[in-house]
Amino acid sequence: MQNSRPGIQKGARAQRRFAWCASHLAFGLALSLTLLGCTSGPPAPDQGSYVEELEAARAARDKAYRESEDPIPAAKRDTLLPLRYYPPDQNYAVPAQLSLFESRQEVEVPTSTGTLRRMELVGTLNFTVGGQRVSLGALVPAGTRQIEELFVPFADLTTGKDTYKAGRYLDIPPTATGLYTIDFNQAYNPTCAYNESYECPYPPPSNRLKVEIRAGEKAPGA
C-alpha cells in the first residue's frame, strides 16, 4: 500500500513511509469528526466542537511537518508553516451517495513528474455543493482487493488562485451503505506542493468541479 499512496518520493523507502503516515496523522482526527457515513447516523457535532477538533487536526499536521525531514525542506518551513486554510465552514460538509460501477475501470492518472500511475475508478460520489449538483470519481490503487480508503483528487474554481495549482485531495473511508459525508474542510494539498521530488497524481478531467470550494487547505504561502 505504501507505494500506491499519493505523494511518493521517488527512490526512498523511508520517504514512502512518511508519505503514508503524514497524511493519516494529519487528517485521522478530522476524518472522525463527520462520521463519514449514513445520514441517519449520529447527529453532526456542534459548530464549536467541530471547529476545535478540526483546528487540532491541523495543528497536528503542522507539528508533524515541522518535526520531520520531509516533505517540507528545512529552509522553507518558516515560510510555509503554519499551513494556510480557509476558515472552517460546515456548509462544505455535504451528504453524498456513492454509485458503484459494476466493474472497476482501470485508468492511468498523470502525475507531477510526467509519469502515469495505474489506478482503478470504483464509482462516483454524487452530491450538491454551492447550489450545484456535481460528482467526483472515487479511486483506489490498481490491484486493490479490500478497499480501506477512497482516494478523491479534485480541482475547482479556486484552483490556481487561492488553492494549489494542481488540485487537492480527500481520503474517505468506505461505508457499508454507500452514504457518505464529503467534508471539504479536510481537503489537503499533495506533498509535491511543498517538495517537487515527490510524485503526485493529478485530478482526472471528470474531477474538475465548476464551482468554488472555499474550504480546506489553501496554496502554500497563500
Predicted ranges, named:
Residues 50-124:
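N-terminal secretory signal peptides
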Residues 194-222:
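C-terminal partner/receptor-binding element of secreted or periplasmic proteins
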Residues 102-165:
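Mid-length scaffold segments of soluble, non-membrane domains
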Residues 35-37:
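C-terminal motif of bacterial Sec signal peptides marking the signal peptidase cleavage site
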Residues 152-188:
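Acidic, glycine-rich flexible loop segments
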Residues 39-41:
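Bacterial signal peptide processing site
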